[in-house]
């Protein structure tokens, strides 16, 4: 039979563990929600610790990337999770854009010379560890070396596209 003091200590430890776990779980779920902790410039929206701005003035991929760097000290959006893609998708859909494609920061500077599509990189230099292709770019007949979100996929999947086309784009930046 346990002594009352031992039982009390065990109850306290269990309560402490449960409180810690709920705090950790709460922290994790907060990372996935749009953040109200940061204030973005007018016309931009916060998600996590970044601001996102959808620019509807069409540019080539290179000019769009330069624009994100010059105006926001950021990059074309680099999408690292399904939660982030869902957020960006809703941002694009809510803009009522008539465009079928939106530039993101993914590109293949090797122009397909590396095997198995391994040349694809984020313009921000973030490591490409999450893949969400609408179609495999390394076997497409009409290859492009810059990536877009496509309306066909609900702006949730990536597709390779000709970098010289002029399209709207999404910038991602910190404030």
Swiss-Prot record:
Pfam families: Lectin_C (PF00059). Constituent of ilotropin, which is a partially purified preparation of cellophane wrapping (CW) pancreata. Capable of initiating duct cell proliferation, a prerequisite for islet neogenesis. Induction: Found 1 and 2 days after cellophane wrapping, absent by the 6th day. This period coincides with islet neogenesis. Keywords: Disulfide bond, Lectin, Secreted, Signal. Disulfide bonds join 40-51, 68-171, 146-163. Residues 38-175 form the C-type lectin domain. The gene is INGAP. It comes from the Eukaryota. Residues 1-26 form the signal peptide. It is found in: Secreted. PROSITE patterns: C_TYPE_LECTIN_1, C_TYPE_LECTIN_2. SMART domains: CLECT. The keyword Signal applies. GO terms for molecular function: carbohydrate binding. Expressed only in CW animals pancreas and to a lesser extent in duodenum. In pancreas it is found in acinar cells, but not in islets. InterPro entries: C-type_lectin-like, C-type_lectin-like/link_sf, C-type_lectin/snaclec_domain, C-type_lectin_CS, CTDL_fold. This is Pancreatic beta cell growth factor. Its main location: secreted. It comes from Mesocricetus auratus (Golden hamster). GO terms for cellular component: extracellular region. The keyword DNA-binding does not apply.
């Amino acid at each position: 039979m346990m002594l009352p003091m031992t039982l009390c200590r065990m109850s306290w430890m269990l309560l402490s563990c449960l409180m810690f776990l709920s705090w950790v779980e709460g922290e994790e779920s907060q990372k996935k929600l749009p953040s109200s902790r940061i204030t973005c410039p007018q016309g931009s929206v916060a998600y996590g610790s970044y601001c996102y701005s959808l620019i509807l003035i069409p540019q080539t991929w290179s000019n769009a990337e330069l624009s994100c760097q010059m105006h926001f000290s950021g990059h074309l959006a680099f999408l690292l999770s399904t939660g982030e893609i869902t957020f960006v998708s809703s941002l694009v859909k809510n803009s009522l854009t008539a465009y079928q494609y939106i530039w993101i920061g993914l590109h293949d500077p090797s122009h397909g010379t590396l095997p198995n599509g391994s040349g694809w990189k984020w313009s921000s230099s973030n490591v490409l560890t999450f893949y969400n292709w609408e179609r495999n770019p390394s076997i497409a007949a009409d290859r492009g070396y810059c990536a877009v979100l496509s309306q066909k996929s609900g702006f949730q999947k990536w597709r390779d596209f000709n970098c010289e086309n002029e399209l709207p784009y999404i910038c991602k930046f910190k404030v």
